[in-house]
């Protein structure tokens, strides 16, 4: 019997062969009276190990001894057995982790020490990495001042200039801006390094440089080495993990799936090799490891698993277990909280095997206790397992700060200090600065190099203070003992021979290509399931279109008696091909929206591009069978195509190939354009070229010789030829109609009349071409994703002042007046005698300022507020029986004027939910309880006028500047009686207050892409609300994402606001002592939505501390410890369980609660002689002013949106020139009917394509602005009509220019008749047609919840409009039951107008003697006398769609809160 059999025999002695059987486990527990003697167990254990030892190494490292069957897996309820770790199920993994790390805070260190101990016992060294960087420099090329603003004009001149630079004929006007300047240092293994520095100091650039990830747009010099090896000697992306500050994830995946996918791609590194060696040495030394540790290490070292135990471990230590099976979510899909998303970004890299971690601002949105726990876990890993870590944190609390061994302080791209944490204060004291007692050292370090904050820390009273520049600090550090030690160490190169062979990754990917492909296939299948609605909708849409097509080309109406009737069949075939092509259009949006995540993962070397592109192609093939099947099976017989079954299947086969070709084409365009707007325009353009040169619109003989190559490379030509030959060479058409005229069969005559090759082999040529194009486009898609970089993501422009300041700081000069800050005139704090919060202790002069406008102080009280939502489906699936999930459970409290209240609690306590309920921002769910404003019940309409709400996500119009954003808000929210000068003065004062003066002309931009930094955006959000002069302000996490200095600026703003007598409530996550003690009162909630403290903080938080310390069992606060952190730590659910208490019950029995209840009762009564809030109008400005303001903002946004406007002008011009050259001089020919068809084809193609381009490219623009509209409307700035008015009216001038450019070029080149009337009619129809298309696109966005669905809905109508336009089938040939739609189709009216205005009055006879005018009337049904009516109807369509857009915006709100 082999060894494996022996193991099985031993295991089955007790278990009857069941590897994980449950038999008897219910009553047999660890210390049960029935348990076997420990000796017997030990013997059995020894037997198992002996059997394991006999296995060959490969099998031995795959098997471990685990408890079997115990329900919770703790203890050995079902005895122990040998299990293949590769197949561990979720329950076994959870049980194993539960035994190893029951509580992450307490057990993680013990667990890691056990791992280390096992490795140390056999003398294996852990690989470590020492990172050195010497003389690193980085500078960016930027445009200075207004030339960098992305206006339509600038984008054209800058593009031309860059082309000139590349050719060397124009000078480069860009200037260089220093980002990093001559930085050198050493990052040691087994030490935690904290990277600090104000925003813009170059932290991200330094981390990217150290991780080997610097972008090509930076000029960099200097060298970075790992264990003495240069970056080119190994693969830095896999040796080091860079964790970005931007959270890019696929919203439709759960947290667990996201991390599991990442673990699968990154592989297990050298874990398996180490385990093999470990196993070998243990066997030689006869050492038996701890069974659970052995199982964990073996399971974690197995590559190619869909779920790895390591993923579960990371979920545990990051505190993500609670939301592991929740969707990550995005702006349109509800998912996890911001703090949880941040942890997912961290976890995504931690599940991999990288030994060096460079983490960029990983604590944004986390409370201080969570941050502490995560950093502590990282510290244990780094110290025990020998990792290397550099972590930049924004606002580390003192206890988190103390976890680090080394500090790097960066300012203006230079290292001010690098070395042990213990020496940093000594260094600054040597330069004359001292950190006050109740001040976190990290906060002190962030502020001490800043011009605005430095003065308060000056400690040499014998000398007058003067500003010490960064350059002076840098030179002081070089002569300081720590600086000298680093310089000496750098002088001696690292000994490469000491580098562990497994320390640096040398393979490009973490897993074999086959495994990466499999991982991507699994993910793609998952996403297709989650996005199944899109595919179902697409199939449904095709079904609808096929129903229309088959009733339009109905077989009883379809004759086979002439070449003309054959033309109608050709029309039906052409329409089918076009529909199947258009069906692939939604691939464009699906591709582009997944690209940001793809680029992130590709650059981290998760997988090569081909392993991503192949599944996105192959897995769509089964869907094609269903979609195309639906169309062909429904239409083929009903339209009456050739009745031969072979022709039927050949048509189905060809349509499948066409659909695949179209999907591949759109995926390629999406991958190459990488931006939705550009992709839409480009896709329309490609379709247009393929269609016009495809042989149906313009017959082959009519194609100009300079364009004939286009005909031969158009996929549509091959599709059209193949499908026509398949039908018209069939036996139904194999008859001679008029033998005297021609002895060719009818089918051949029809084919020849349309310039199609009348040979049967063209079916297979066409089919082969479709397959060829499919492969080509997929290959091009793969190449695009392999080599292209993400779309426009670097910062392009800076202001003159900013550049001057950067350069001056580099040279140690001082620019401008130093003492310009609010708060910079505080008295210096010698020896830390000043203890109060520096934020509160501000100049009274500041607090009295900025308030030139009066307001009424208001209080807000709420009693027994409950909020619940419908039970989510996932929870119902897990067996939860309730219909509703209660998020707030009877919360009561009050907020008063002049009192700053902090709303706190751990993640998931319901802080934002409570705030949304009180502010009236919830759009769904069930609210109960009473809310009163100064004693009167709250009415949302009036409340919006007196309140401000600063959202956590800073949503602003991207294309306006800071000053313009504030001007817009003030203009619409301040009362009408405030004149323009007072308004501007007030804005200036608010900008001073929020310290935005230096950024007044900076473009806001999109978060994470361009424009303002997180902290500047946050201050803008506050300023936008402040300029409204509200009485009550809600702020959702105003300091999240900010460093200590920025947070202090924001809190100073908040404090100044409160001191003017306003009511301010802030939710807050991880306040420093400074920030926490700037608050007057605290409203504390626990997870589950119950309050556990509401009351004053007291001096140095004394009241709060006294309350919690009076609860028996709560540990006392340590000296100098942050009360906010202590309070969150002592009130966790774990603490409640340990003490056996419920903090909300304790609070409800306290005297404090009674006092609060009395206060709420008091505030719920109106004051004598007071009256309820009343405003004569809902909005502060008249409708006309609202319209003008919205138009003003839209005007700025459009002018600065070149991806939309410059691109559409460019493409319109290109299309005009193309059409001009393709249809050159065909406008004057009217001798044959085909000449008229050609001229009409030029009109039809232009109308349809430029129209569709406008329609699709306007949608993303409106979708972005709509999210801003939701915020601004909720803030009571304007109603829906003015917004719609602004959005609609601004399109008119742009469309006018677009149509004029097109009209002049095309009219001249095609050679229509040169009379003023005809020219202006042509222009009139083009202008209004482009307008109604644009407004239709806007309407589609207004009527649908998101951009994806809008593009699908609108594309459905393109098809129907195309069909009824009068080109594919003329109106007189349309069956009577569809004739009504010819009158309802806007494109049909446009073509009517264009054809009749050009040809409706021409009396010239054609070759058969019929006057042109008569042919137009008979064949198309177009009468010249109707021209005026036609013009009216076309203009009316534009008006109708614009009105429907306004209506949709007014009635539908798709924001879910």
Curated annotation (Swiss-Prot):
Q: Membrane-spanning residues where?
A: 533-553, 565-585, 621-641, 653-673, 677-697, 706-726, 765-785, 1209-1229, 1244-1264, 1292-1312, 1319-1339, 1349-1369, 1380-1400, 1429-1449
Instruction: Name it.
Output: ABC transporter G family member 36
Q: Which organism is it from?
A: Oryza sativa subsp. indica
- Role summary: May be a general defense protein.
Q: Tell me which family the UniProt entry assigns to this protein.
A: Belongs to the ABC transporter superfamily. ABCG family. PDR (TC 3.A.1.205) subfamily.
Query: Taxonomically, what lineage is the organism?
Result: Eukaryota, Viridiplantae, Streptophyta, Embryophyta, Tracheophyta
Tell me the ranges covered by the ABC transmembrane type-2 domain, including all copies.
515-728, 1185-1399
Its membrane topology: Multi-pass membrane protein
Residues bound to ATP 2 are 905-912
SMART domains under this entry? Answer: AAA
Residues involved in ATP 1 binding: 197-204
**In the record, what terms sit under GO molecular function?**
ABC-type transporter activity; ATP binding; ATP hydrolysis activity
From the record, what ranges are coiled-coil?
none
């Amino acid at each position: 019997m082999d060894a494996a059999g022996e193991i099985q025999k031993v295991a089955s002695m007790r278990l009857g062969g069941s590897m994980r059987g449950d038999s008897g486990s219910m009553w047999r527990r660890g210390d049960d009276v029935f348990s076997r003697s420990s000796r017997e167990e030990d013997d059995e254990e020894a037997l198992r190990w002996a059997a394991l030892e006999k296995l060959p190494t490969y099998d031995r490292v795959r098997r471990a001894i685990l408890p079997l069957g115990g329900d919770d897996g703790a203890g050995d309820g079902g005895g122990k057995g040998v299990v293949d770790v590769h197949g561990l199920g979720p329950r076994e993994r959870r049980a194993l982790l539960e035994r190893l790390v029951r509580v992450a805070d307490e057990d993680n260190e013990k667990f890691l020490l056990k791992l280390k101990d096992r490795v140390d016992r056999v003398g294996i060294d852990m690989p470590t990495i020492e990172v050195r960087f010497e003389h690193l420099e980085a500078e960016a090329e930027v445009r200075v001042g207004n030339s960098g603003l992305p206006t339509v004009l600038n984008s054209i001149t800058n593009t031309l200039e860059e082309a000139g630079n590349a050719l060397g004929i124009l000078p480069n006007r860009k200037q260089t801006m220093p980002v990093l300047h001559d930085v050198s240092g050493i990052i040691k293994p087994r030490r935690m390094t904290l990277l600090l520095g104000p925003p813009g100091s170059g932290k991200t650039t330094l981390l990217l440089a150290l991780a080997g990830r610097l972008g090509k747009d930076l000029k960099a010099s200097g060298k970075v080495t790992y264990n003495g090896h240069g970056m080119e000697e190994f693969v830095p992306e896999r040796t080091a993990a860079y964790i970005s500050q931007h959270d890019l994830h696929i919203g439709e995946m759960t947290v667990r799936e996201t991390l599991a996918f990442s673990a699968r791609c990154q592989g297990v590194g050298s874990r398996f090799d180490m385990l093999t060696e470990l196993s070998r040495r243990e066997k030689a030394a006869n050492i038996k490891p701890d069974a659970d540790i052995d199982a964990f290490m073996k399971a974690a070292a197995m590559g190619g698993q869909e779920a790895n135990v390591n993923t579960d471990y990371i979920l545990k230590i990051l505190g993500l277990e609670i939301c592991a099976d929740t969707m990550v979510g995005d702006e349109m899909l509800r998912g996890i909280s911001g703090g949880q998303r941040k942890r997912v970004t961290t976890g995504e890299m931690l599940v991999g095997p990288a030994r060096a971690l460079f983490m960029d601002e990983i604590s944004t949105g986390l409370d201080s206790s969570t941050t502490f726990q995560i950093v502590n876990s990282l510290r244990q890993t780094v110290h025990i397992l020998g990792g290397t870590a550099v972590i930049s944190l924004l606002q580390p609390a003192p206890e988190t700060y103390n976890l680090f061994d080394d500090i790097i302080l960066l300012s203006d791209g230079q290292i001010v200090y690098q070395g042990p944490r213990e020496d940093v204060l000594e260094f600054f004291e040597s330069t004359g600065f001292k950190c006050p007692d109740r001040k976190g050292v990290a906060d002190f370090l962030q502020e001490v190099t800043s011009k605005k904050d430095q003065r308060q820390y000056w400690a040499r009273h014998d000398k007058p203070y003067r500003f010490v520049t960064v350059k002076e600090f840098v030179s002081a550090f070089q002569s300081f003992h720590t600086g000298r030690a680093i310089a000496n160490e750098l002088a001696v190169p690292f000994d490469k021979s000491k580098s562990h062979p497994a320390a640096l990754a040398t393979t490009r990917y973490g897993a074999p290509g086959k495994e990466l492909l499999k991982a991507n296939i699994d993910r793609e299948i998952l996403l297709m399931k989650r996005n199944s609605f899109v595919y179902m909708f697409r199939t449904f849409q095709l079904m609808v279109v096929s129903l229309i097509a088959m009733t339009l080309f109905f077989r009883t109406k379809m004759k086979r008696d002439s070449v003309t009737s054959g033309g109608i069949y050709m029309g039906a075939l052409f329409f089918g091909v076009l529909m199947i092509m258009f069906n692939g259009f939604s691939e464009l949006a699906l591709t582009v929206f997944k690209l940001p995540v793809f680029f992130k993962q590709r650059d981290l070397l998760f997988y090569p591009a081909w392993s991503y592109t192949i599944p996105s192609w192959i897995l769509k093939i089964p869907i094609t069978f269903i979609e195309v099947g639906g169309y062909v099976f429904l239409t083929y017989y009903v339209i009456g195509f050739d009745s031969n079954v072979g022709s039927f299947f050949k048509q189905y086969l060809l349509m499948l190939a066409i659909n695949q070709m179209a999907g591949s084409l759109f995926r390629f365009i999406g991958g190459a354009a990488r931006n939705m707007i550009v992709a839409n325009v480009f896709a329309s353009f490609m379709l247009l070229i393929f269609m016009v040169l495809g042989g149906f619109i313009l017959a082959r003989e009519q194609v100009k010789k300079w364009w004939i190559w286009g005909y031969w490379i158009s996929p549509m030509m091959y599709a059209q030829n193949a499908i026509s030959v398949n039908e018209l060479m069939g036996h139904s058409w194999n008859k001679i109609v008029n033998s005297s005229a021609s002895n060719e069969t009818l089918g051949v005559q029809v084919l020849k009349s349309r310039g199609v090759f009348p040979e049967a082999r063209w079916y297979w040529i066409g089919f082969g071409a479709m397959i060829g194009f499919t492969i080509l486009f997929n290959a091009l898609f793969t190449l695009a994703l392999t080599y292209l970089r993400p779309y426009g993501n670097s910062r392009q422009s800076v202001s003159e002042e900013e550049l001057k300041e950067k350069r001056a700081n580099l040279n140690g000069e001082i620019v401008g007046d130093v003492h310009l800050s609010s708060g910079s005139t505080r008295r210096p704090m010698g020896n830390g005698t000043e203890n109060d919060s520096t934020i509160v202790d501000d100049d009274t002069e500041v607090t009295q300022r900025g308030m030139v406008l009066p307001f009424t102080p208001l209080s807000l009280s709420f009693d027994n507020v409950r909020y619940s939502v419908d039970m989510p489906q996932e929870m119902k699936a897990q067996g939860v029986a309730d219909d509703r999930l209660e998020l707030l459970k009877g919360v009561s409290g009050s907020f008063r004027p002049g009192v700053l209240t902090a709303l706190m609690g751990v993640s998931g306590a319901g802080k934002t939910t409570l705030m949304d309920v009180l502010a009236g921002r919830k759009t769904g769910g069930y609210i109960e309880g009473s809310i009163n404003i100064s004693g009167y019940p709250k009415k949302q309409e009036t409340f919006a006028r007196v309140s401000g709400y600063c959202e956590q996500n800073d949503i602003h119009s991207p294309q306006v500047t800071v000053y313009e954003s504030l001007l817009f808000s003030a203009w619409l929210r301040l009362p009408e009686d405030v004149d323009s000068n007072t308004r501007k003065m007030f804005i200036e004062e608010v900008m001073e207050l929020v310290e935005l003066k230096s950024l007044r002309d900076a473009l806001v931009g999109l978060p994470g892409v361009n424009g303002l930094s997180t902290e500047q955006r946050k201050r803008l959000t506050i300023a936008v609300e402040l300029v409204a002069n509200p009485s009550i302000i809600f702020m959702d996490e105003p300091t999240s994402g900010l460093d200590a200095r920025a947070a202090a600026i924001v809190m100073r703003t908040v404090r100044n606001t409160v001191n003017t007598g306003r009511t301010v409530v802030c939710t807050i996550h991880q306040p420093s002592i400074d920030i926490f003690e700037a608050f007057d009162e605290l409203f504390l909630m626990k997870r589950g939505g119950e309050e556990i403290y509401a009351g004053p903080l007291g001096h140095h938080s004394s009241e709060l501390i006294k309350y919690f310390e009076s609860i028996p069992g709560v540990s006392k606060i340590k000296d100098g410890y942050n009360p906010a952190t202590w309070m969150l730590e002592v009130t966790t659910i774990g603490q409640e369980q340990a003490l056996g208490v419920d903090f909300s019950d304790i609070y409800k029995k306290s005297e404090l609660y009674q006092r609060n209840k009395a206060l709420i009762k008091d505030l719920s009564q109106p004051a004598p002689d007071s009256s309820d809030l009343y405003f004569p109008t809902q909005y502060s400005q008249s409708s006309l002013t609202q319209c003008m303001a919205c138009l003003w903002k839209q005007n700025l946004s459009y002018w600065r949106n070149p991806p939309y406007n410059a691109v559409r002008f460019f493409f319109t011009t290109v299309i005009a020139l193309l059409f001009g050259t393709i249809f050159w001089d065909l406008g004057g020919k009217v001798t044959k009917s085909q000449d008229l068809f050609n001229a009409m084809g030029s009109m039809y193609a232009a109308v349809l394509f430029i129209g569709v381009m406008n329609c699709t490219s306007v949608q993303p623009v409106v979708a972005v602005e709509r999210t801003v509209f939701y915020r601004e409307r909720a803030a009571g700035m304007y109603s829906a009509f003015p917004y719609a008015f602004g959005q609609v009216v601004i399109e008119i001038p742009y469309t006018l220019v677009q149509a004029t450019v097109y009209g002049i070029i095309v009219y001249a080149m095609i050679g229509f008749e040169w009379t003023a009337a005809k020219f202006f009619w042509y222009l009139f129809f083009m202008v209004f047609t482009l307008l109604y298309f644009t407004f239709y696109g806007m309407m589609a966005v207004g009527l649908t919840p998101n951009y994806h669905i809008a593009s699908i809905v609108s594309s459905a109508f393109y098809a129907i409009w195309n069909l009824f336009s009068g080109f594919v089938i003329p109106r007189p040939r349309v069956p009577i039951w569809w004739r009504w739609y010819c009158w309802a189709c806007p494109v049909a009216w446009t073509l009517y107008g264009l054809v009749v205005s050009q040809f409706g009055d021409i009396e010239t006879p054609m070759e058969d003697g019929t006057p042109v005018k008569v042919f137009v009337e008979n064949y198309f049904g177009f009468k010249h006398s109707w021209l005026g009516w036609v013009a009216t109807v076309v203009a009316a369509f534009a008006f109708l769609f614009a009105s429907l857009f306004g209506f949709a915006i007014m009635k539908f709100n798709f924001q879910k809160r």
